[in-house]
């Protein structure tokens, strides 16, 4: 397969699959409470439910790892490809999160708060769903690109 097509196809496919994970976000958050819950499910639930600050922390760790010298026998460009894919996947996850929120918007607007008054979802939350993670990983991607070229 053409490497350029592969670079486009893999993140999109992974993003779609992980977008489905976002659709079951509440289900994933409930899973870690089970005593027999596997550790990888706990990790996945933690990543999916992470706040913007936590995602930024993860991104900083990834940038630090990417900036370190390559392991013997593993060229640095291989690490660059991994982070290229990871950045795209996380961006698509955020997009999927925003789309799921948009699809549920009419139902969300109809809910009533504890005081009995109708609730509403602010537009800022929708914007955050679409742009939060891609922005974080675009920034980290820039750091990685600088490290690769220096």
Give residue spans per PLM region:
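Hydrophobic, small-residue-rich transmembrane alpha-helices and their short perimembrane loops
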Residues: 1-150
